[in-house]
Structure formats: structure tokens, C-alpha cells
């Protein structure tokens, strides 16, 4: 169970709380002393022995500008400070693969994040190898790569390393193929025109929502829908 979580934005915290109602979600900027101290105090009170840290990746993601001066890159400092204050048994550090090649400024020097982590925490922790992990190799129906660094406190005998890859690949069809079919919501045309193209839209939507509120139609422009309709199963456009 996740005992304590921190989120900057209220709407995201509310969504997280809906999924994990028993978690104490602390809302606010971890860079602010009052928020940081609240996290530390509650963590110590709850005797936290495992920390998951995933600092925002926009400053290093290939989908973003990869701005070296992006202040979000420096949130790794707060993660390190929390770890040093709590000293949990295990730490799970996750981010985009570019984390392994991203520099942060420390003592007026540019230093790679993995090197920085080790310089700050090697006194207390053993590190797993800096691995790029693909979720598809662990029964997740998504081809998604991430940098995963696992830390084990030095007083523990068991060293935490990534598990062996699963032999079977799970496809999206394997995972959700049993759910009711949905038609897309085409938002760049009048709704009447949309219903002419997808006359079963509302009937299928009602059936899907009766099973899960999360099973609702994706929103697309008509051009995208036409391309996807003509894209064979198992292929990408």
C-alpha cells in the first residue's frame, strides 16, 4: 500500500486520491520547506521503509524541449534529500531513459544524474545497474521504456535487482479485447454528422460505461479516424 504521496497540482492529487483512497496525499511544492517537512514528519511517523521517486521528466524527455535549465530537472535534489532523511530499506527511481544522460548542476559543476545519485547516496545504499527497462517485457501491454534504478540499504542482505524478463508478450488485445467495442468521438464535425458515421455510438457508449467509467471513447478529429479505420490490426499509421 502507498501510505504517503506528494503532488503539486490539486486536480492530479484529487485523481490520485480517487484511485488510492487510503493514501495520505500531500498537495504542494516539495521545494517549499513546509511541504518538505510535512512529508518527512509523516513518513517517519508511518515508519516508511520504501520510497518510489519519479521526478517530472519534461526537462529531459524527447517529447519536450530537453532544456538543461528546466527547474524540474533539479527536483532530483528533493528526492535525494527525502531519501537521506528517511533512509528507507528500498528506493525505486524511475524516469525517462534520457535521465541517464542528463546533467544537473552541483557545486558549480555539471554532473550526470546517475553519478550525482551515487555520490550522494552510495554511503547508505547499494545500487542496481542503471537499466533501461521496457514494460512490454513484464506483461504490460505497452511498448514503453524507462530508466529504472533500484537502491538497497547497505544493512540488508538481499540486494534488489530487476526481475527476469517475462517470456510471453501481452498485447493490448490480450488485455482489454474482452471489453465492449467503442466508436470514437469525432469532435471537429457536428454531432449529427458524427452519428451518421457512427450510428451505434450512443448505444455502445452506454454499454461500455455500465462496465467501467474509465471505458469511454477517445476523442479524435475526423482525419485521424479515417486513417485509423484503414490501418490493419497490428500495424501503425
Question: Model-derived features: where do they sit?
Answer:
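Class I S-adenosyl-L-methionine
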Residues: 40-45, 57-237
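N-terminal Rossmann-like NAD(P) cofactor-binding module of classical short-chain dehydrogenase/reductase
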Residues: 50-52, 92
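Conserved Rossmann-fold cofactor-binding substructure of NAD(P)-dependent oxidoreductases
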Residues: 31-43
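Extended hydrophobic secondary-structure segments that form protein cores and membrane-embedded regions
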Residues: 4-5, 51, 132
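Generic alpha-helix structural propensity
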Residues: 8-11, 25, 34, 46, ...
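SAM cofactor-binding core of SAM-dependent methyltransferases
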Residues: 1-32
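Anionic group-transfer/hydrolysis microenvironments
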Residues: 9, 31, 56, 96-97
Amino acid at each position: 500500500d502507498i501510505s504517503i504521496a506528494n503532488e503539486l497540482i490539486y486536480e492530479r492529487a484529487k485523481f490520485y486520491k480517487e484511485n488510492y483512497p487510503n493514501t495520505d496525499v500531500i498537495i504542494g511544492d516539495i521545494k517549499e520547506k513546509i511541504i518538505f517537512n510535512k512529508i518527512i514528519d509523516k513518513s517517519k511517523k508511518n515508519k516508511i521503509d520504501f520510497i518510489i521517486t519519479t521526478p517530472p521528466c519534461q526537462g529531459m524527455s524527447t517529447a519536450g524541449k530537453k532544456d538543461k535549465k528546466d527547474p524540474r530537472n533539479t527536483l532530483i535534489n528533493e528526492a535525494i534529500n527525502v531519501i537521506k532523511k528517511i533512509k528507507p530499506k528500498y528506493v525505486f527511481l524511475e524516469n525517462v531513459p534520457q535521465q541517464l544522460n542528463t546533467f544537473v548542476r552541483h557545486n558549480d559543476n555539471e554532473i550526470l544524474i546517475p553519478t550525482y545519485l551515487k555520490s550522494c547516496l552510495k554511503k547508505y545504499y547499494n545500487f542496481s545497474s542503471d537499466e533501461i527497462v521496457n514494460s512490454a517485457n513484464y506483461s504490460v501491454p505497452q511498448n514503453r521504456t524507462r530508466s529504472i534504478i533500484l537502491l538497497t540499504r547497505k544493512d540488508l542482505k538481499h540486494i534488489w535487482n530487476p526481475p527476469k524478463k517475462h517470456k510471453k508478450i501481452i498485447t493490448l488485445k490480450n488485455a482489454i479485447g474482452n471489453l465492449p467495442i467503442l466508436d470514437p468521438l469525432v469532435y471537429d464535425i457536428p454531432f449529427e454528422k458524427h452519428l451518421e458515421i457512427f450510428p451505434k455510438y450512443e448505444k455502445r457508449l452506454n454499454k461500455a460505461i455500465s462496465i467501467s467509467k474509465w471505458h469511454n471513447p477517445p476523442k479524435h478529429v475526423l482525419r485521424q479516424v479515417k486513417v485509423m479505420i484503414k490501418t490493419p490490426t497490428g500495424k501503425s499509421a
